[in-house]
Amino acid sequence: MAPQERLLIRGGRVVNDDFSQVADVLVEDGVVRALGRDLLPPGDTSRGLRILDAAGKLVLPGGIDTHTHMQFPFMGSQSVDDFHQGTKAALAGGTTMIIDFAIPQKGSSLIEAFETWRNWADPKVCCDYSLHVAVTWWSDKVKEEMKTLAQDKGVNSFKMFMAYKDLYMVQDQQMYAAFSQCKEIGAIAQVHAENGDLIAEGAKKMLALGITGPEGHELCRPEAVEAEATLRAITIASAVNCPLYIVHVMSKSAAKVIADAKREGKVVYGEPIAAGLGTDGTQYWNKEWRHAAHHVMGPPLRPDPSTPGFLMNLLANGDLTTTGSDNCTFNTCQKALGKDDFTKIPNGVNGVEDRMSVIWEKGVHSGKMDENRFVAVTSTNAAKIFNLYPKKGRIAVGSDADIVIWDPEATRTISAKTHHQAVNFNIFEGMVCHGVPLVTISRGRVVYEAGVFDVTAGHGKFIPRQPFAEFIYKRVKQRDQTCTPIPVKRAPYKGEVITLKPRETKEDDTAGTRMQGHS
């Protein structure tokens, strides 16, 4: 694929997170070279310049999907959107970068998992990508590998699971240790916030009651299970003074916990996803098993139909910060592994292609947020948190030319029949969305235009991320300087100190226990 060296995007409304302006955008060698009015006279196509007319359209920074799982081996199967198909679909939806997860098994090397995911992705990706790395166990080796990943491999985010007991779940003391190391190396800690112990017990209870269908998935993981874990994670992170990022915020209860924590000054960020913003958990009670199973994911969609609107309100007002898709797709025949037991249904839904349109429809078209906030929650905030800004997440001189020409008035109807993902269903089936990407530009190349791709596997590149992102660590460093407890200066105690007698007999122990119980 020959390089496309020069583009002029003419006459569009350039939208960044902080302001909008009508301007031309000149792109050369994969970056934005100039931004302003009437950069070149009409008809100047010299030296290979291609002019794209964006009059009446919006020119947006390419979307950054903070949460994907391409070709992920999980629950006995593997997600069907691989790094090629999944990233092509992302481009069709206006997303020009994804951040996927390298997830080692317990006892396995984090660095080896990272290299495995790199080997899967590098030859296939059609857009730029980066990797979070999961911490699924704890040891001195894990601690050292986190440091190596942050310093040498371009990883500045590590995810801990509070769910998936006996698979990925870590205990509180392990989470405290991992959070402490994140702070030491300048990374941001991420958590999947659900109480894994309660989920395990709840699943047993549902199956004992004869509830084997997809509704059992939500019934054993109610909102309280998500909210409790969210509060616990925030409490642990606050004790460490470590910045925290809550992935896939799915419930009103968990979102309220995050909003309250932000009002208390905690450095915490919440990530709702396209699924939770675009549909709800009433789907689990659908009479058709396959329809219900298609929506199974963890944490589950919530049956309260007001949840998507509530999450969008908090996303619009700043209580929630970014958006991902948690794209982890399994075909119906894979979901059918759990046809007689909901605990065996592979968890995951689509969203990488439809995230931008769903958020525009439910957020901007509904009047909840403006175009600038849309750019913030789909691109810029992620770039700032994960230390990609201003190369990503902004249209400015020197920024990467990851750009979308967006038609806010056009509509499209989402359907599995027309989407570009490998999965054979779509949880947003039939949704009419205002807001359609007309042209997607990745690394300075037009890779998608009017429904046609011009991109090959390997076009995208791995983007390393440096630690100590200023957007989050400025506050953390200042708090270390000003909020560290100090001892009270006082004169030493010089009075009498009693002598404790050693307990030598079982009777002494019993007596001591009785005395303590009546003190």
From Swiss-Prot:
GO cellular component term, pick one: protein-containing complex
Entry binding sites for Zn(2+) 1: 67, 69, 159, 326
Keyword Transferase: no
Residues the entry annotates as binding substrate: 164, 347
SUPFAM superfamilies: Composite domain of metallo-dependent hydrolases, Metallo-dependent hydrolases
UniProt: Zn(2+) 2 binding residues: 159, 192, 248
EC code(s) of this entry: 3.5.2.2
Modified residues annotated as Phosphoserine in this record: 79
Function per UniProt: Catalyzes the second step of the reductive pyrimidine degradation, the reversible hydrolytic ring opening of dihydropyrimidines. Can catalyze the ring opening of 5,6-dihydrouracil to N-carbamyl-alanine and of 5,6-dihydrothymine to N-carbamyl-amino isobutyrate.
Family affiliation: Belongs to the metallo-dependent hydrolases superfamily. Hydantoinase/dihydropyrimidinase family.
Protein name as catalogued: Dihydropyrimidinase
Organism name: Rattus norvegicus (Rat)
